[in-house]
Amino acid sequence: VRYSNTYYFYRLGWTGLNVDALPGTANLFRRMRPKDITVECGIGAKEGFLTYFAFNDPALNTFSAQEAERKNHPPYHVVNKVQLPVMTLAKLLDQQLPKGMAIDFMTVDTEGLDHDVIASNDWDRYRPKVVLVELLNTGIADLPSNPTARLLQGQRYQLYAKTCNTFFFVAQEAAHRWNVQSA
């Protein structure tokens, strides 16, 4: 539950869909969050296989070779590289999201491939009210040139808040209903 953006909500009674590529993680999720749906797979721009870089601190694990290289310095180091299957977010939601269930809250934190995950969604069919996305090395002033922020804004999401590396975007229709102002 360390660094979890969703465990607090689970403890309040919310349920959801957990996705983690780290082999063996699904068992831990199922034990800690038995009411949730848990899937052990990677999400990417297209179906296939990607190299997964596992670190001595799992919070740094990534499919991004660039992020792995950037973080592979003491006290952290890559302990394993493995080819893992990945699918698009839209396909995962097609397979796992119960029919008729709306997504209120989605958090994407993939250590460097967040844009690929966001871009692989079908935003007409799967439209979370709130999207949290990690944008590494990005400040609010950088958003106009950030491809992930531009993609979300093009899908009618507006920035609401930012913490460290995580940006909170709210669907415009939800923001209007909730009387939420842009950041």
Feature-to-residue mapping (PLM):
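Phosphate/nucleotide-binding beta-alpha loop and adjacent structural elements of enzyme active sites
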Residues: 1-183
